[in-house]
């Protein structure tokens, strides 16, 4: 099916979603499975950049959700000491052998988890981390230890997600658009970007920066307050602003624009990508 045909079939299935079960056959099942396969291969994305703006393929997100209704829970093996798990989403790596790994071209350290329908591009390094379904991780990115890439999140090229970073998903609670980290960004340890916020290209978030839709993002130089988006080339740290009753509330502060000194501290190490 073409993408336009898939979209029409997914939208029809979504309207009848209460009737969809693991026993469902026909066009609805075929469309959902084809969409999940396209997401898994990276030929389709939940969100794609068109010029300076991001376009969200809402129907692809709906297909991810419909996939939960089409599959029964089953035992997944491979746990410590012969343990198992109980889930309805397969691993991206299920049944992979040497040929599939070589063709994929990324590195996956033991104990990383990637669920089927997430795309991982060539040159990516996955430390013991979690990448949820529908996500897209582009070339040369490092997903460091205990980092989480949420459902349908979009991670650009040559991004570094430091240890314990959380990139929010869109499925629960439902968000209109995915969280997006554009190319060449560095996200410091234990930082969180959630609720469909966008970190624009080349930005650096220091350790422990938390950004959601209601987080004030303050430009220290101009005093401008913005929400939901970090401008390109920003260096951002955690801060606070005065509020009612003499209490300071958390905010994220743009302290400067990325310069040569910042790049030298946050550049990726090509030796780790070989």
Curated annotation (Swiss-Prot):
Positions of substrate binding: 107, 144
Catalytic activity as recorded in UniProt: (S)-2,3,4,5-tetrahydrodipicolinate + succinyl-CoA + H2O = (S)-2-succinylamino-6-oxoheptanedioate + CoA
EC number: 2.3.1.117
A GO CC term attached to the entry: cytoplasm
BP GO annotations: diaminopimelate biosynthetic process; lysine biosynthetic process via diaminopimelate
Compartment(s): Cytoplasm
Pathway(s) this gene product operates in, as recorded in its UniProt entry: Amino-acid biosynthesis; L-lysine biosynthesis via DAP pathway; LL-2,6-diaminopimelate from (S)-tetrahydrodipicolinate (succinylase route): step 1/3
Enzyme class: transferase
Chain ranges passing through the membrane: none
Main subcellular localisation: cytoplasm
Keywords (A to Z) from UniProt: Acyltransferase, Amino-acid biosynthesis, Cytoplasm, Diaminopimelate biosynthesis, Lysine biosynthesis, Repeat, Transferase
One function term, GO molecular function aspect: nucleotidyltransferase activity
PANTHER family: 2,3,4,5-TETRAHYDROPYRIDINE-2,6-DICARBOXYLATE N-SUCCINYLTRANSFERASE, MOLYBDENUM COFACTOR GUANYLYLTRANSFERASE
Subunit structure of this chain's protein: Homotrimer.
Family to which the UniProt record says this protein belongs: Belongs to the transferase hexapeptide repeat family.
Protein name: 2,3,4,5-tetrahydropyridine-2,6-dicarboxylate N-succinyltransferase
Organism: Cereibacter sphaeroides (strain ATCC 17025 / ATH 2.4.3)
């Amino acid at each position: 099916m073409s993408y336009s045909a898939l979209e029409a079939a997914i939208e029809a299935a979504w309207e009848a979603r209460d009737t969809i079960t693991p026993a469902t056959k026909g066009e609805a099942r075929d469309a959902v499975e084809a969409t999940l396969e396209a997401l898994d291969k990276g030929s389709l994305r939940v969100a794609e950049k068109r010029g300076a703006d991001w376009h969200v393929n809402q129907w692809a997100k709906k297909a991810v959700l419909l996939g939960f209704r089409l599959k029964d829970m089953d035992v997944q093996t491979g746990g410590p000491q012969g343990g198992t798990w109980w889930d309805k989403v397969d691993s991206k790596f299920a049944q992979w052998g040497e040929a599939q790994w070589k063709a994929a071209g990324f590195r996956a350290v033991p104990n990383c988890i990637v669920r089927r329908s997430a795309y991982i591009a060539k040159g990516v390094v996955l430390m013991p981390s979690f990448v949820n379904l529908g996500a897209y991780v582009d070339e040369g990115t490092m997903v460091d230890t205990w980092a989480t890439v949420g459902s349908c999140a979009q991670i650009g090229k040559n991004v570094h997600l430091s240890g314990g970073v959380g990139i929010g998903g869109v499925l629960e609670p439902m968000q209109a658009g995915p969280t997006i980290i554009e190319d060449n960004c560095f996200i410091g340890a234990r930082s969180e970007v959630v609720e469909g916020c966008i970190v624009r290209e080349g930005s650096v978030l220091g350790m422990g920066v938390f950004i959601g839709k209601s987080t004030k993002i303050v430009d220290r130089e101009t005093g401008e307050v913005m929400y939901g988006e970090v401008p390109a080339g920003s260096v951002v740290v955690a801060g606070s602003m005065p509020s009612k009753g003499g209490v300071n509330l958390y905010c994220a502060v743009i302290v400067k624009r990325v310069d040569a000194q910042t790049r030298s501290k946050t550049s990726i190490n090509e030796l780790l990508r070989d």
